[in-house]
From Swiss-Prot:
Name of this chain's protein: Polyneuridine aldehyde esterase
Keywords, ordered alphabetically: Alkaloid metabolism, Hydrolase, Serine esterase
Gene3D superfamilies reported in the protein's UniProt record: alpha/beta hydrolase
Gene that encodes it: PNAE
Consequence of substituting D216A: Loss of function
Species this protein is from: Rauvolfia serpentina (Serpentine wood)
């Protein structure tokens, strides 16, 4: 009886990283959630982390998000997961919400892009460009890749950008780890521009929560709050002294927020 009650209380958290990063960013949060008795799946999206595919093999946003879609497809029909998406990972969360709304108890966006069912999938990026200075990315590098007739745009995070805008509240060890493990990524802007927007009937039916990281210098808190004001969230949390990488600079606070959101 006791074990049955524990099983009922156990939740399954699926963690989705942002662009150029990987499942490794959750190395502090995953054991905290597991020690609280929960199941955790940290996903490496295509051509990210230790996923074996290369960026030049990934042609669409759906290709990029495929590992998350595979996890969602494997979830039993009677189970619901808690999704957590960080940064660009919020867009992959949106795809999972549109495709498998019945398998998600709540989708949590942390310093993340939040798709708007009333606008195109590129709308969040257009607003980011409006609200954030053009030199925000500092020494990050952008270049074309793939088919010369229809090239994609790749992005490599610059060490200065990472140190000053993403990991400024993290330990030097976490910053060094990130410099070693980041990979070229893409925002798949051209593909998203052609994609059908997410629906209010499916994407919009999933309960949403947002976690603000209030010392984020790459996703300023004003931009994060704009998502909540324009798209809406059922629950909102704020983590003080958290930079863009809140799961590394404030892992216990992120864990606490997640447990509170998932319990309500």
């Amino acid at each position: 009886m006791h074990s049955a009650a524990n099983a009922k209380q156990q939740k399954h958290f699926v963690l989705v990283h942002g662009g150029c990063l990987g499942a490794w960013i959750w190395y502090k949060l995953k054991p905290l959630l597991e020690s609280a008795g929960h199941k955790v799946t940290a996903v490496d999206l295509s051509a990210a982390g230790i996923n074996p595919r290369r960026l030049d093999e990934i042609h669409t946003f759906r290709d990029y998000s495929e590992p998350l879609m595979e996890v969602m497809a494997s979830i039993p029909p009677d189970e619901k997961v808690v999704l957590l998406g960080h940064s660009f990972g919020g867009m992959s969360l949106g795809l999972a919400m549109e495709t498998y709304p019945e398998k998600i108890s709540v989708a949590v966006f942390m310093s993340a892009m939040m798709p708007d069912p009333n606008h195109s999938l590129t709308y969040p990026f257009e607003k980011y460009n409006e609200k954030c200075p053009a030199d925000m990315m500092l020494d990050s590098q952008f270049s074309t890749y793939g088919n010369p007739e229809n090239p994609g745009m790749s992005m490599i995070l610059g060490p200065q950008f990472m140190a000053l805008k993403m990991f400024q509240n993290c330990s030097v060890e976490d910053l060094e780890l990130a410099k070693m493990l980041t990979r070229p990524g893409s925002l798949f802007f051209q593909d998203l521009a052609k994609a059908k927007k997410f629906s209010t009937e499916r994407y919009g039916s999933v309960k949403r929560a947002y976690i603000f990281c209030n010392e984020d210098k790459s996703f300023p808190v004003e931009f994060q709050k704009w998502f909540v004001e324009s798209v809406g969230a059922d629950k909102v949390k704020e983590i003080k002294e958290a930079d863009h990488m809140g799961m590394l600079s404030q892992p216990r606070e992120v864990c606490k927020c997640l447990l509170d959101i998932s319990d309500s």
